[in-house]
Amino acid sequence: MDKLFTPGKIGKLTIKNRAVLAPMQMMYGEHQGYAGEKAIAYYEERARGGVGLIIVEGVNVDEVNNKPWNLQMSLASDKYTASFQPLTEAIHKYDCRCFVQLHHYGAKSAPTAAGKAWAASEVPVAPGGPSAHKMTVEEIKIVEQRFIDAAVRAQKAGFDGVELAGSHGYLLHQFLSPYYNDRTDEYGGSIENCLRIYTEIVQGIKARLGKDFPVSVRFCGDEFTPHIPKTRTVEDAPAIARVLEAAGADVLNVSNGNNFNANANCEPYSYDSFWKAHVTRAVKEAISIPLIATNTIKDPLVAEETLEKGLCDFVALGRALIADPFFMKKAAKGDVVGIRKCIGCMYCREQLYAQLPVKCALNPRVGYESVYPLVPEQDGAGRVVAVIGGGPAGMQSAVTLAKRGFDVTLFEKEDTLGGTMNLADKGPHKEKIARFVETMKAEVERAGVKVLLGKAPSIDEVKALAPEGVVMAAGAAPIVPRIPGVDKPHVCTAYDVISGDVKVSGKVALIGSGITGLECAEMMLNEGCQVAMIEMLDAVGTGMFSVIINDIMSRIKPKDPTMYLHTMLTEIDDGYVMVKDVKTGEEKRIEADHVVLSLGVAPRADVLAEYRSAFKNVICVGDNAQRGRIPHATKEGYIKSLVFLKD
């Protein structure tokens, strides 16, 4: 990985390697807009982890005509500047450079006390939404000055450079996009005019801070919305890049997507690396200044390949460094398997959309770096602990306890560790989960955990260890309803199908449409089955993040399954099932050669009760505690094991 670890330059600024922490809203600011302990600890850990340049998430530049999200940090006035100095000092301790992104929501802002959100035109963010205030030329100059003033504050706070947030549907992008910009003055029409607000801000910053103060511009290379009229495509990207370079930008940071397609910049798991490489290449070939680019990079080998192909000069690592802040240090040692590689589950984005601080399914410490120690207290003193179950919660518990100095034995009834993740990675496009399983296996081994596979232990076998405590992580069992015919041989669970233990064909009645049910439906449709999806609720995927559901349904719907909503299974018989509309009471017979149950799981309460009656100190984590997902499993396994058997 020679190229990844070769120093690079942005203007006169030397960067120790080619990895950049991409700017991502984390919601780690203080309530008043200050940078506080939470943000400082988060960014310091990424600097400690070896990245060359950190671009701190977008900070607000306008408190009058822009309403930021909850917990967004701000450089909109001088009162905030001092709060960022500890942040830049913390980053610089590790020979890491830092920029800060300057941000304005534009039409995406909620109305402020001053009135409607300011934007390029009155076009609302989404059809039917509130219209924005079309800025006058005088108002554009006011906002430009607010960006420039924020850059001055950034320099005073110790930042090495700044970046303009000119992508992802925010104010500057609203000027660039013909969909939002219907102006006929000098700020609309041609690419040069649509970029005028960008170029005047860049030139204004240079005039105030000098030509050697680096300015990055993040812009949209392709909005990837062919169904929306008048949007930017890759054909526009080279011309956009050349205008920005001519204006004095020191580096460009190309991203993609807009308000109609955020998946183009924060992709679900179904997207592969290099899917948008053609955009990056088009920009790179058009400019002579350095280029930062995302490439759905979750693996250092992909980062190296991106650089080797000449697609960019610096690779932007976003969710990869949320999942594992030590990505670069591990890569430098060649420890690729030791990196917790983002699986694209979108839990981080799900939190953000709910206006909550970002969390990560794979990294339970993210956002809590100042609370949970990187190295836990060594208080195990060789005491014995048994962990029952080798899924994500069990493995995380075992590793955490071993790091505390406990003597840990992990029991797993299957022949390999991983638990339900070994099924989750079998669904279409879910191969990335296997990477996490392999990393967790490596962590278990490196922590010195004793692993016993292939048999569920008896109580006596566990007692023979004389454990001081037991961690129950035995998972959950599929729910099977008590209805006539459920025990017939053509009835199975979604787990049976996904694992490959049962092959189905012909007409299939799928009962339930949670995430597992939808993945099973996609698998069966891909194999040519005629699938009838039967769901008691009014929509499929209820309770799951809409982005993931929409991504899966975009592949399921074209295969034309039959869908029955607010419909309950009442009986199974040979060749058919009986269902009832829960709203009207109407009964219906649906032909089915196979019936696949996907009704969720229930904790193994009987196993838990047995262990609690046999041992004094028992904690329960993961699905064994409550039905959950990978983020719940890793968080419970980590946090509960940090405090288990404390004096």
Tell what function each PLM region has.
Residues 1-8, 37, 366-372, 450-456, ...:
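Short gly/ser/thr-rich secondary-structure transition/capping motifs
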Residues 1-388, 392, 397-403, 407-408, ...:
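Flavin-dependent oxidoreductase catalytic cores
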Residues 22, 101-103, 165-167, 173, ...:
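Generic beta-strand/beta-sheet core signal
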Residues 95-96, 213, 289, 467, ...:
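A short helix->loop->beta-strand "cap" motif at the edges of active sites that frequently abuts
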Residues 287, 310-311, 447, 487, ...:
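Short, structured coil segments at secondary-structure junctions
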Residues 301, 379-410, 452-469, 473-490, ...:
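Rossmann-like dinucleotide/flavin-binding elements
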Residues 343-364, 488, 559, 628-631, ...:
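Flexible, Lys/Arg-rich cytosolic regulatory linkers and terminal tails that connect or flank
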Residues 407-447, 521-569, 625-628:
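Rossmann-like dinucleotide-binding cores of NAD(P)H-dependent redox enzymes
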